[in-house]
Amino acid sequence: MFQTESHPAGGSPLQSIRSSCDRCRLQKLKCTVQSMESDGRMVCERCVRAKVPCAFGRRRRASRPSDTKKQGDSSTRRSTAPRTTNPEPTVLTPPLSTTSSTSEQTLGGATPSPTLATSSALEAPLETLAECEPDTTAPTYSYHHHHHDSYQLGEGPPTPFPNPATTGGGSGSSMMDWDWLEQDFHANELYCLDPELLASAPASTSTSTGSPTAHHRALPDGGSGSSTMSMGGGADTPFSTTASVAGRRLPALIAEMQQRLEALENGAWLHDGAQSFDHYPIGAVLRLSQEFGALAGQVLGMAATYGGGGGVPPSDVAGLQMMAAVGGGGGLYELGRGGLAEGGSSTATVLLVLGGYVFLVRLYGLVLGHFHAHLNRIPSGSLGGHMHSTPAPTTSPTLQLGELPSGGAMPDVSRIHAALGMLLAALHSVEEQLGQGGEVAREMVVSILTQGSGLEPAKLQDGFGDLGEKVRSVKELLREKMGL
């Protein structure tokens, strides 16, 4: 397998045969010549055992140039240096020099610019530029760096996401601006827990400076709704500001509902190993219900006031249902302009109200499921047939189930009984604004859908019917555990 390479006699770079075969040299192993074949080829032991061809190559002359050759190369480079073209004035500066020379000619300068000779170098053939060695001098870096900085510091191409620092504010109208959030939405009030307040508070009242919960408060004696809102719909009223705040607050509130729902779903409340429900966050659920009811009442109050022309309060569910059924006939919806009538709540805000109610129903369903599972783990007993527990004097977002008052020999059952009453009272206040099962908001959305797509309201199914079944199931378990 050994083959000698034929080269001219005077310029052959090959020398003597190597002492190790190519295979051993590649694997960096010791090569031991075993025998010499009849044709003159040498074979090593490893190649014989591996039954592979064994080839011994020849050494090559060193490629390192001698001192004489180095001197000759340096003199050759010096002699050919004047014939090379300097790439610095040819490649980098022509764009700038061409601009300057053009401007001077435009201004009518009599003396030609010295950069014209440089700009004429642009006409040099590409072969001349290709012969030049690449140069990485400072002007090359400074030119490109300057060009990059000018692009970065400039206005640049238009972007669909404006920069608040350059647009001069305007972030107040953005839904992602959280500066308008209030830290305290009066969640400590008991307006939704007292039946007398629920019956006496006209939900259509509101002020421009009041909190969202002021939507449920009664007017002062002798006051009327005409002092705080306009029935015409053409003039500026406090409702426009209130609806704007409600429309901006609803997405954040729905996000809080989703976070609370995920936190309760991932908790240990459904496991048999849960020792106690004392730390169950009942106050957070109550706060979400109360705040959502206030915001929903404001949004639907705007729709009723400006859409129907009659100033129907949101608590008048029958009036809102009639207006929603009439639809475009009462001026409530004008789909040609993409929303409700001018001055009323937008279609997107009404959809947010319905979406928030969906999350609230899911949240209540999960809480009732936790109560049901916890009551199943408690042995049945008797509390004497009566419960004398009252709600806590104050309710806060941090209220826990263990902080509720308890009575009798079964404190867990009595606390769940009190918590269920508070939750149902809060849900009742929400349904006073939205109707039973969110019927008012659904009728408004259905009216939009039927006008836009021709759907029949009878074909839309109610997806919240199982919530009443869960309430009845928990009540039956409470009666069973209490021995009633």
UniProtKB/Swiss-Prot annotation:
Q: Which cysteines are joined by disulfide bonds?
A: none
- GO molecular function terms here? DNA binding; DNA-binding transcription factor activity, RNA polymerase II-specific; zinc ion binding
Q: Which residues bind DNA?
A: 21-54
Renumbered to this chain, the Basic and acidic residues biased-composition regions fall at: 64-76
A GO CC term? nucleus
SMART domains for the chain:
GAL4 (SM00066)
Q: Keyword DNA-binding: yes or no? A: yes
Entry's InterPro entries?
Carb_Metab_Trans_Reg, Zn2-C6_fun-type_DNA-bd_sf, Zn2Cys6_DnaBD
User: Bias regions of kind Low complexity — which residues?
Assistant: 77-107, 202-213
User: Where is the region Disordered?
Assistant: 59-117, 136-174, 202-242, 386-406
Keywords (alphabetical) are:
DNA-binding, Metal-binding, Nucleus, Transcription, Transcription regulation, Zinc
Superkingdom assignment: Eukaryota
Location in or out of the cell: Nucleus
Q: What does this protein do?
A: Transcription factor that regulates the expression of the gene cluster that mediates the biosynthesis of the tetramic acid Sch210972, a potential anti-HIV fungal natural product that contains a decalin core.
What is this protein called in UniProt?
Answer: Transcription factor cghD
The organism is: Chaetomium globosum (strain ATCC 6205 / CBS 148.51 / DSM 1962 / NBRC 6347 / NRRL 1970)
Q: What lineage does UniProt assign to this protein's organism?
A: Eukaryota, Fungi, Dikarya, Ascomycota, Pezizomycotina
